[in-house]
Amino acid sequence: MSIDVANESGVPADEERLARLARYILDALRVHPLAELSVLLVDEEPMADLHVRWMNEPGPTDVLSFPMDELRPGAPGRTSEPGILGDVVICPQVAARQAERAGHSMQDEIDLLCTHGILHLLGYDHAEPDEHREMFSLQNELLAGWRRSLEEEER
């Protein structure tokens, strides 16, 4: 699995942890081992530019996903097709503000945003109430499993 993480923001970030998180999520969702994913951290100005260009919304946002191939999670016992999953773009400055409001660390918020972005790349959405329940339930389940795996590593 090819996971490329690049930090083009002015905010220090744990790129290795983000790559490990992405691998954890893709493995949990049985995405093909030859799939490719890019995670990019950018400052507010480039994120605002992307937000206007692709979503026609002003100002920076927390995370944007740009799917390439239309990959979906694998079925039980099978992986998905190989291909290029796409790009997840995260703005750490927006993440920091959201983390403060939510009462958790910026790293926890970036983990959440990365997970959320990957789920969008895999076809999940939250426009309708039933989609929202499904996506956020899976997101919470994946993040809980990720935190458990980190705790086990620390032992």
From Swiss-Prot:
Binding site for Zn(2+): 116, 120, 126
SUPFAM superfamilies membership: Metalloproteases ('zincins'), catalytic domain
GO molecular function: metalloendopeptidase activity; RNA endonuclease activity; zinc ion binding
Gene3D superfamilies xref list: Metalloproteases ('zincins'), catalytic domain (3.40.390.30)
Cofactor(s) for this UniProt protein: Zn(2+)
Chief subcellular location: cytoplasm
PROSITE patterns with a match to the protein in the record: UPF0054 (PS01306)
Short name of one Pfam family: YbeY
Localization annotation: Cytoplasm
Gene Ontology terms describing biological process: rRNA processing
Record key words, sorted: Cytoplasm, Endonuclease, Hydrolase, Metal-binding, Nuclease, Ribosome biogenesis, rRNA processing, Zinc
GO cellular component entries: cytoplasm
InterPro entries: MetalPrtase_cat_dom_sf_prd, YbeY, YbeY_CS
UniProt cofactor note: Binds 1 zinc ion.
EC number: 3.1.-.-
PANTHER family: ENDORIBONUCLEASE YBEY, CHLOROPLASTIC
Stated role: Single strand-specific metallo-endoribonuclease involved in late-stage 70S ribosome quality control and in maturation of the 3' terminus of the 16S rRNA.
The family this protein is said to belong to: Belongs to the endoribonuclease YbeY family.
Protein name: Endoribonuclease YbeY
Biological source species: Thermobifida fusca (strain YX)
Protein encoded by which gene: ybeY
